[in-house]
UniProtKB/Swiss-Prot annotation:
It comes from Streptococcus equi subsp. equi (strain 4047). Its main location: membrane. Binds 1 zinc ion per subunit. It is a multi-pass membrane protein. Zn(2+) binds at H143, H147, E225. This is Protease HtpX homolog. GO terms for molecular function: metalloendopeptidase activity; zinc ion binding. The active site is at E144. One of its GO terms (biological process) is proteolysis.
Amino acid sequence: MLYQQISQNKRRTVILLFAFFVLLVVIGAAAGYLLADSYQLGAAFALIIGAIYAFSMIFQSTSLVMGMNKAKEITVNDAPDFFHIVEDMALVAQIPMPRVFIIDDPSLNAFATGSSPQNAAVAATTGLLKVMNREELEAVIGHEVSHIRNYDIRISTIAVALASAVTLISSIGGRMMWYSGGRRRDNDRNDNGFGAIMLIFSILSLILAPLAASLVQLAISRQREYLADASSVALTRNPEGMIRALQKLSNSQPMTHPVDDASAALYINEPRKKEKLSALFSTHPPIEDRIERLKHM
């Protein structure tokens, strides 16, 4: 059952990433049709913009991300238990030892970053280290190490980049169509019915694509959280430890320092004040759902 869940989550992520690329091509084609009467040119432009965004974000410095989140690098002498747990989990996962950081914050949280296992890092709050027992801390670190091993940071970064690219292209397309004085619209009024249909479809694509992109990006983030939970259990062989850790995380207070959207998606638990929004608009699945899945393993 455990490995079936892992495989299912991986398949869902592939499907969502494919949907993202389709969405990017559609928004590019719509903009190209409205502005240059060329689907191909618009789609190619959209893919280039998406690739530039993805590469620039993937290679963002690990130290920069840690600095933005007030994390300080430690050695084995600073927090030996925490350091050795990270070391043990990395060994079991068969990845290089990540750099280890601590965030001085009373909330219960942790995250991993790095575009590959070779330049990865793990951070945990002082609150987490104080409250979690060894089994629970192993489960949390197993979750973060699984993100590294599964290249989740890279996948999530690509999703954020593609969502940003879709929003940018939609904004550019909308502004240029407005400033062009409606030449495309005038042409389509004199065209056949198909041209009018394509005009409406293109305009709707520009309007709705950013929302759709955000929903897909958030869905990918949630799937990777489910996958990391299951992968942590595969590493520790202790689903109860993961369940107890999640139960404690559910009672955590928000982080005391501001956390930006990109960083928030990295944490094991939503680091900001939890708003009563639909699960569709959350970077993290409800902890109750995560626990329920673990109980059925």
